[in-house]
C-alpha cells in the first residue's frame, strides 16, 4: 500500500500539471488506503479517471516535457540532478493573432523563405514589329534598368552590339491590357502621342508593374516592347500642328490628317525657299543604310519655338542652311525615296552669300566651273539685259547657261594666246602624278571640257585643282579682254621655282635588279626633271660610276654578280686611292701605284658620292650595320615613301652644292645655256 501511495505522491509532484478536478481525487485515494479490504478495483478506476482528466487538460495548458520519461524519486535528491535536465517549453500559435513585431518564419533572418530568395519571375519581351517574343528572368528587387541589362544579354547581336542598355526604351501596349490600371502608375509613366503605349521609367519595380498591369499572369501576347533609339523617317517628325499640342494632351490625330499637314508644311517651305531665291545645284544624294543607328540626342529634334501659327512661317534654320535638293520641285509621289542626308548638302554659287554666317558649310564645284561667269551673268541681268534661262540636266551634275555656254567653251579651247593656261594644266597634272608614283599622259583641254563634270570630294588635291582651274579661267578672261597676255605673267609662269633650281643639278645612279622598282623610281625622277641612270647589278654600277657625274647612288644590297655591299666597298676604295675627299696623310701612302683602270680624273670627281642603301630584307638591323660599315651614307627600307624620298633628294642636292659649289655652278650655267 505504501508503494501505491508513494507512486501517487510522485505522480502528484511530477512534471505533469493537473487540473483541480484531478486533485479532488486524492482524498478518495487516501480513504481507500486506510480501509482493510484493499479495494484494488476502486483504486485502479480512480487512477484511470485521473489520467483521462490529465490528457484532456494537456490540449489547453502548456506541457512540461521531462527529458526522461521515467525517473525514480531519488533523482531529485542527487546533486545537480535537476540542474542538468532543464525542461523545454513549447507553445502553439494556432489561436493567437499575428502581430508585426513577432518573429515568424516568413520574416525571420534565418528563414529560408525570405523575399530575397524568392524564385525569379519570367517577363516576356519582344522587339517592335516582330512576332517572336522571348523571356528574361527578373528578381523581386529588379527595376526596369536591370530589365534593360537582361534584354541586352538576351539580344547580344542585334541590340547589344549597337546600343547601350541605358538607351533602350521599354513600353507596354495598352491594347493588350484588359484590367483597369491604377492612376498612380499612369502618372509615373510617359504616354507617347500617337500610339497607345506607355514608356516605363528606369526606376520602376518590375514585379510591381507585373502585379498592376498583369494581375492574372503575363502571357506571350502581353510581351513588353523593347525599342532602340533609331532615327525616325520624315513622316514621323513633329509638324507645326503636333508641335503646338500640350504635353499633357493625349488627343489622337488620324494618319491622313498628319500626312496632309506635312505636305502643306513642305509646300510652305518650298515657297519660302523660292521667295529667298536660294537656287541649289542638284546632286545625287548617297542613300543611308537601313541599319544605321543614330542616337536620340543626335536626331533632328524639331524645336517647338521654331514653328509659328502664322500663315507665312520663316524658320531661321532655312536661312542658315543651304537648300535641300528635295525642295527643287521633286514630286512626293516619285518612286525614288530620298532619305535625309545629315551632312551639309551641296549648294549653288548663288547661295554662297547666305552661307557666310555658317562656317560649317561646304561648297563643292565641278572642275571646270568658275564663279566669274556667274558674277558676269548677274551683272548683265542687273544692267537690264534679258536673263538667260537656267537649265538643270537630268543627272543634276552641272548647270549650263544658254548664253554663256559658247563663251566658256571658247575660253577652254587651247589657242596661241593661252599658253599660260596650258602650262598650269601641265603643272597640275604633274603634281597629281607625283603622288601616285606613275607617269601618265596629260589629257587635252578638249577632253576635259567634253567629259561630264562630277562632284569631287573635298580633299587637298581637289581643292588645289579647283583653285587652279578657277584662277586659270579668270586669267583667260583677262587675256581675251585685253587681246594679249601680259609679259609679266608669262615670265612668272616660266620662271623656275627654287626646288627646280636645286634638283636638276643632281645626277642619280639607281642600282636595282627588279624591273618594277626600276620603273617606279624612273618615273619618280623623270617627273622631277632629275637626270638618272639605271644599273642592274653591282659590277655595272661600278662601271657607270667610273664615268663620273653622279652625286647620289641608290644602291640595292641584294644584287646579282656583285652585291651592293661589295660594290660600295670598291667605290670607297677607288675614292681613297684617287684622293677624292678629305683624308689624313697617314691613311694613304705616298708611293702608292694606281692602275690605269682605277685612275679617276680630278675634274670629274670633286667630292665623294652619296651612297644610300636599299633593302627589303626582314633582317634589316644586320643589313643596316653592314651597309654603314661598308661606307654607305644612309639606309632605307623598302617600300620607300616617295614624298620622303623627294625631301631627302633635295637635302642631298643641297649638300652637294655646298661641297662642290664651283662644279654645281658651272653645271647649272651649262643647263641655262642649253
Swiss-Prot record:
Domain Response regulatory: 507-653
Name assigned to this protein: Oxidative stress response two-component system protein SSK1
Triggers of expression: Expression is detected as early as 1 hour after infection of reconstituted human esophageal tissue and increases thereafter up to 48 hours postinfection.
Modified residues (4-aspartylphosphate): 556
InterPro entries with a match to the protein in the record: CheY-like_superfamily (IPR011006), Sig_transdc_resp-reg_receiver (IPR001789)
PROSITE patterns membership: RESPONSE_REGULATORY
Stretch list, region Disordered: 66-115, 259-354, 372-497
Top-level taxon of the source organism: Eukaryota
Function: Final receptor of the SLN1-YPD1-SSK1 two-component regulatory system, which controls activity of the HOG1 pathway in response to oxidative stress and probably also to the osmolarity of the extracellular environment. Involved in cell wall biosynthesis, hyphal growth, and virulence. Regulates the expression of CHK1, as well as of a subset of genes whose functions are associated with cell wall biosynthesis and adaptation to oxidative stress. Provides at least partial adaptive functions for the survival following encounter with human neutrophils.
Low complexity bias spans: 264-276, 343-352, 372-383, 422-433, 459-481
Gene: SSK1
Compositionally biased residues, Polar residues: 66-75, 101-115, 302-314, 323-336, 434-444
One function term, GO molecular function aspect: phosphorelay response regulator activity
Pfam annotation, one family: Response_reg
Keyword terms of this UniProt record: Phosphoprotein, Stress response, Two-component regulatory system, Virulence
Record keyword Phosphoprotein present: yes
GO biological process: cellular response to heat; cellular response to neutral pH; cellular response to oxidative stress; cellular response to starvation; filamentous growth; filamentous growth of a population of unicellular organisms; filamentous growth of a population of unicellular organisms in response to biotic stimulus; filamentous growth of a population of unicellular organisms in response to neutral pH
Residue ranges, compositional bias (Basic and acidic residues): 90-99, 391-416
Amino acid at each position: 500500500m505504501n508503494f501505491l501511495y508513494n507512486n501517487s505522491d510522485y505522480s502528484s509532484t511530477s512534471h505533469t500539471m493537473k487540473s483541480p478536478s484531478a486533485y479532488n481525487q486524492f482524498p478518495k485515494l487516501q480513504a481507500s488506503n486506510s480501509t482493510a479490504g484493499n479495494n484494488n478495483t476502486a483504486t485502479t478506476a480512480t487512477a484511470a479517471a485521473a489520467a483521462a482528466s490529465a490528457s484532456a487538460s494537456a490540449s489547453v495548458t502548456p506541457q512540461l516535457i521531462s527529458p526522461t520519461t521515467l525517473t525514480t524519486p531519488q533523482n531529485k535528491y542527487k546533486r545537480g540532478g535537476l540542474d542538468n535536465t532543464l525542461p523545454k517549453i513549447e507553445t502553439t500559435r494556432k489561436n493567437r493573432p499575428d502581430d508585426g513585431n513577432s518573429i515568424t518564419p516568413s520574416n525571420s533572418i534565418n528563414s529560408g523563405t525570405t523575399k530575397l530568395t524568392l524564385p525569379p519571375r519570367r517577363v516576356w519581351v519582344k522587339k517592335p514589329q516582330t512576332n517572336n517574343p522571348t523571356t528574361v528572368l527578373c528578381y523581386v528587387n529588379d527595376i526596369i534598368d536591370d530589365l534593360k541589362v537582361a534584354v541586352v544579354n538576351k539580344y547580344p547581336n542585334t541590340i547589344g552590339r549597337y546600343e547601350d542598355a541605358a538607351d533602350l526604351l521599354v513600353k507596354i501596349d495598352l491594347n493588350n491590357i484588359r484590367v483597369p490600371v491604377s492612376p498612380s502608375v499612369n502618372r509615373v509613366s510617359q504616354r507617347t502621342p500617337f500610339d497607345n503605349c506607355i514608356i516605363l521609367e528606369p526606376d520602376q519595380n518590375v514585379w510591381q508593374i507585373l502585379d498592376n498591369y498583369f494581375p492574372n499572369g503575363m502571357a506571350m501576347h502581353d510581351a513588353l516592347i523593347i525599342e532602340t533609339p533609331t532615327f525616325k523617317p520624315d513622316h514621323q517628325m513633329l509638324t507645326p500642328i503636333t508641335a503646338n499640342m500640350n504635353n499633357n494632351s493625349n488627343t489622337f490625330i488620324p494618319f491622313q490628317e498628319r500626312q496632309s499637314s506635312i505636305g502643306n508644311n513642305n509646300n510652305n517651305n518650298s515657297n519660302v525657299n523660292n521667295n529667298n531665291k536660294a537656287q541649289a545645284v542638284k546632286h545625287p544624294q548617297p542613300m543611308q543604310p537601313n541599319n544605321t543607328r543614330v542616337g536620340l540626342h543626335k536626331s533632328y529634334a524639331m524645336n517647338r519655338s521654331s514653328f509659328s501659327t502664322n500663315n507665312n512661317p520663316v524658320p531661321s534654320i532655312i536661312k542658315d542652311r543651304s537648300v535641300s535638293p528635295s525642295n527643287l520641285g521633286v514630286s512626293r509621289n516619285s518612286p525614288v525615296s530620298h532619305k535625309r542626308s545629315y551632312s551639309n548638302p551641296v549648294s549653288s554659287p548663288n547661295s554662297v552669300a547666305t552661307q557666310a554666317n555658317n562656317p560649317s558649310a561646304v561648297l563643292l564645284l565641278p572642275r571646270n566651273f568658275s564663279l566669274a561667269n556667274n558674277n558676269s551673268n548677274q551683272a548683265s541681268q542687273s544692267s537690264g539685259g534679258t536673263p538667260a534661262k537656267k537649265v538643270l540636266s537630268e543627272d543634276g551634275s552641272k548647270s549650263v547657261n544658254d548664253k554663256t555656254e559658247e563663251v566658256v567653251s571658247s575660253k577652254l579651247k587651247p589657242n596661241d594666246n593661252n599658253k599660260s593656261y596650258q602650262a598650269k594644266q601641265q603643272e597640275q597634272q604633274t603634281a597629281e602624278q607625283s603622288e601616285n608614283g606613275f607617269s601618265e599622259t596629260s589629257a587635252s583641254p578638249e577632253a576635259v571640257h567634253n567629259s561630264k563634270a562630277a562632284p569631287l570630294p573635298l580633299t587637298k588635291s581637289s581643292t588645289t585643282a579647283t583653285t587652279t582651274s578657277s584662277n586659270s579661267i579668270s586669267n583667260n578672261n583677262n587675256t581675251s579682254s585685253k587681246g594679249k597676255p601680259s609679259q609679266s605673267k608669262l615670265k612668272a609662269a616660266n620662271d623656275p621655282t627654287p626646288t627646280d633650281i636645286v634638283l636638276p643639278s643632281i645626277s642619280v645612279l639607281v642600282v636595282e635588279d627588279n624591273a618594277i622598282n626600276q620603273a617606279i623610281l624612273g618615273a619618280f625622277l623623270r617627273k622631277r626633271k632629275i637626270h638618272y641612270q639605271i644599273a642592274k647589278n653591282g659590277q655595272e654600277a661600278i662601271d657607270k660610276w667610273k664615268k663620273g657625274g653622279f652625286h647620289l647612288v641608290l644602291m640595292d644590297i641584294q644584287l646579282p654578280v656583285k652585291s651592293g655591299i661589295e660594290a660600295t666597298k670598291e667605290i670607297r676604295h677607288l675614292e681613297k686611292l684617287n684622293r677624292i675627299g678629305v683624308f689624313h696623310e697617314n691613311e694613304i701612302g705616298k708611293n702608292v701605284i694606281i692602275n690605269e683602270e682605277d685612275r679617276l680624273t680630278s675634274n670629274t670627281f670633286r667630292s665623294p658620292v652619296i651612297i644610300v642603301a636599299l633593302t627589303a630584307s626582314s633582317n634589316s638591323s644586320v643589313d643596316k650595320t653592314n651597309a654603314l660599315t661598308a661606307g654607305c651614307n644612309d639606309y632605307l627600307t623598302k617600300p620607300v615613301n616617295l614624298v620622303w624620298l623627294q625631301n631627302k633628294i633635295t637635302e642631298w642636292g643641297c649638300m652637294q652644292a655646298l661641297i662642290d659649289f664651283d662644279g654645281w655652278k658651272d653645271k647649272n650655267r651649262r643647263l641655262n645655256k642649253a
